[in-house]
Amino acid sequence: MKVMATGAFDILHPGHGLYLEKAKELGGEDAVLAVVIARDSTVKKKKRIPVIDENQRLEMIKYLKPVDEAYIGHDGDMFEIVEEIKPDIIAIGFDQGHDVNKLQEELDKRGIKAKAMRVEAHRIADLDSTCKIIKKIRNSDFEEDYVNCD
């Protein structure tokens, strides 16, 4: 069974790892997890200017334990990549704004045989979102020298 998970994955944090782990579990014991990284242009439109570019985000995601396949998404029609990957399940993160029912309706309308499912909500760390990490960095005092940080 192939499960597809999507996201910006801009500054990796424990919430990303948990989302990917839970997404893969939706497919059962022998599931294959395909992760789609949002393009920089998509991240800019939906969230903010990404800190890390799409190619580096793709490389980081490939190293994560639950990930079997990784792709950069397409500009425009988000269903193009779904048609290419052909997942059995599309895992929607608990903090992603997609309406699962509307997504399922669109999949059905397009003849895509995938089931949209929401991953359960879990917060496991204080810095469990990219925005929280950015805010902490902005509020930090960096007066001391850092070693090996060119």
Curated annotation (Swiss-Prot):
Transmembrane segments: none annotated. ATP binds at residues 8-9, 13-16, 95, 122. It is an enzyme of class 2 (transferase). Pathway: Cofactor biosynthesis; FAD biosynthesis; FAD from FMN: step 1/1. One of its GO terms (molecular function) is FMN adenylyltransferase activity. Keywords: ATP-binding, FAD, Flavoprotein, FMN, Nucleotide-binding, Nucleotidyltransferase, Transferase. Catalyzes the transfer of the AMP portion of ATP to flavin mononucleotide (FMN) to produce flavin adenine dinucleotide (FAD) coenzyme. Belongs to the archaeal FAD synthase family. HAMAP family: FAD_synth_arch. This is FAD synthase. It comes from Methanobrevibacter ruminantium (strain ATCC 35063 / DSM 1093 / JCM 13430 / OCM 146 / M1).
